[in-house]
């Protein structure tokens, strides 16, 4: 994963997937790029490394940059973060009940571990991501389910 920051940021800008969270997934899945799958297959994210045969079934990429692009474009943007897609269970890391974790990983604490890694990286990097984003909350009381109330801050 060394010297791959630009690849993460470029793919964030191209496909809308947060670079810090992608880095967290890569760090967890590949032990910071040191796992045998990362080294032998250029696969930072454990893509298709199923529990029963991770080394055999994991995808092989021509380079780490190609792997990062495929993860951002195909796996995240077009599948796990695409509403209506079979793997979509919410646009957040989550756990085994909701979010990316439902279909991505067997570890029920996968999302929590990535969030902790991302928080630590952001904290050590000057907290550039902390409080940067607004969260949209869909008003599910509306019968048409078409309104989206965006709040600047929490209220009671």
In which residue ranges do the predicted regions lie?
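The canonical Cys-X-X-Cys-His
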Residues: 25
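Catalytic cores of secreted/periplasmic lytic hydrolases that degrade extracellular macromolecules
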Residues: 1-22, 31-149, 156
